[in-house]
Design a protein with these regions (language model features):
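Generic short beta-strand
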Residues: 24-27, 37, 84, 366-368, ...
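Second-shell loop/turn segments in exported
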Residues: 1, 53-61, 99-103, 111, ...
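A penicillin-recognizing enzyme superfamily signal
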Residues: 1-18, 28-30, 39, 47-56, ...
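Conserved catalytic neighborhood of penicillin-recognizing serine enzymes
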Residues: 81-136, 180, 195-218
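Soluble, non-transmembrane domains of envelope/secretory-pathway proteins that act on or interact
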Residues: 231-415
Length: 415
């Protein structure tokens, strides 16, 4: 397998330039079929200092900013923004969550296109707040991928910046869903997994998928790397524990991960400076590069800012010109547990029953939680609550906001 051997050599050479305890992994797949054409789980399998025997293509890690394209894809699909829509990159408070940019600086007014290319954090969180973290999770499942959330945590805005776990294999599978506009694929090497088409709708409608590729395809290659004709995104996890870069052309997808298998910090690594050069080298040396990114579907094109309808010229601005957090204008929504969930009663180490943590978004504080129509507690400004089920069976959970708007879910509790 010449591609496999080539990527193994790329990984070995790249590993020699990294700290002795830092490993890396690469995975390349055919976006049309799901076939894994090359998979390298470590810089050097026989290197004990790097725990080379651990296959890091299957290890769950924080993706940093690598999921941002999927947030933007949903926003494009829902018609919330266009490439030249202006969004604010300034300090913002999302009900206690205060994201900061990687370089601790803010750009002010930027276009959506610039925000994604520069991987700005605040605009990404603004968009995720608008499309909804739960809706993003559901959409990613179209591509056969379920993000790993912390125990008892509901999907939240931190997902935009890496607040969920994913493997390199699954991340490449998601990007294959971007590259293949027709049908998602499940990656497989024919040994551990079977490559197959997923019987689902396309990950995004064609115009949204093209728009994401059009933006990412114009991101400059890392310094010293020649253009490879790919759309790509990088990611750096909190605390410099993971560096990622994933890219795709019209046929193949390649992902790179760098970090320590023991999850210790690696000061100085970043997706752009550390992982992206390896991505470009591997893509070029694979001999598979060269399939142009798909052309724009009918009716899809870049629209100049001056030609945008008024509603798309600036994102999340109220009639007074003040930036508004979109959640304040939407009715309340229970994001955990979800409708129809089956909840298992857990116990702590001392044998006490653990509460069910409930989480909601949007609405206007204060809020009141009810179970089967009975209030559980006094009104609260928090968007989380705890419920101690009195037994098993079906229950209806409800939250009511200050405007009297309510949201309910039916759940089933079992031992």
């Amino acid at each position: 397998r010449p591609v496999q051997e080539t990527l193994e050599k790329v990984a070995l050479e790249a590993g020699r330039k990294l700290d002795p305890k830092v490993s890396l992994a690469l995975l390349m797949a055919d976006a049309a079929t799901g076939e894994i054409v090359a998979e390298v789980g470590a810089a050097n399998y026989f290197d004990a200092s790097r725990s080379g025997w651990i296959d890091m293509t299957r290890a769950e890690r924080s993706p940093g900013s690598a999921l941002k394209p999927f947030i933007y894809g949903l926003a494009f699909e829902q018609g919330l923004v266009a490439q030249e829509t202006i969004v604010e990159d300034r300090p913002a408070d999302f009900f206690g969550y205060r994201p900061k940019n990687f370089d601790m600086h803010y750009q002010g007014d930027v276009s959506i296109r610039q925000a994604l290319q520069l991987s700005l954090n605040v605009p990404a969180v603004r968009l995720l707040d608008a499309v909804g973290p739960s809706r993003l999770m559901v959409r990613l499942r179209r591509a056969g991928v379920t993000l790993k959330l912390p125990p008892n945590e509901a999907p939240g805005l931190a997902i935009a910046l890496g607040g969920a776990g994913i493997t390199l294999k699954d991340l490449v599978q998601l990007y294959a869903g971007l590259a293949n506009r027709e049908q998602p694929v499940r990656l497989g090497d024919g040994i551990r997994d079977k490559a197959e088409l997923i019987d689902e709708e396309s990950l995004f409608e064609p115009t949204a998928a093209w728009t994401v590729a059009d933006v990412l395809g114009d991101v400059l290659p890392p310094t010293g790397s020649p253009p490879a004709g790919i759309a790509y995104k990088t990611g750096t996890s909190y605390g410099y524990r993971d560096a990622w870069s994933v890219g795709y052309d019209g046929r193949y997808v390649l992902g790179v991960w760098i970090g320590r298998p023991d999850n210790a910090a690696v000061p100085g690594i970043s997706g752009y400076q550390t992982a992206a050069p390896i991505l470009f080298e591997a893509f070029t040396k694979s001999g598979l590069a060269g399939t142009a990114l798909p052309r724009a579907p009918a009716g899809a094109n870049r629209i100049a800012a001056s030609e945008l309808p008024q509603s798309l010229r600036r994102f999340s601005v109220d009639p007074n010109g003040l930036v508004s957090v979109s959640a304040r204008e939407r009715p309340p929504q229970i994001v955990y547990p979800l409708e129809g969930s089956v909840l298992e009663l857990g116990k702590s180490a001392d044998g006490k029953a653990l509460p069910v943590v409930m989480k909601m978004q949007a609405g206007r504080a204060p809020f009141r939680w009810l179970v089967n129509g009975k209030p559980m507690s006094e009104s609260t400004r928090r968007r989380t609550g705890e419920w101690h089920p009195e037994g098993t069976g079906q229950s209806t959970l409800t939250v009511i906001d200050a405007e009297g708007r309510a949201a309910s879910v039916n759940v089933f509790v079992r031992n």
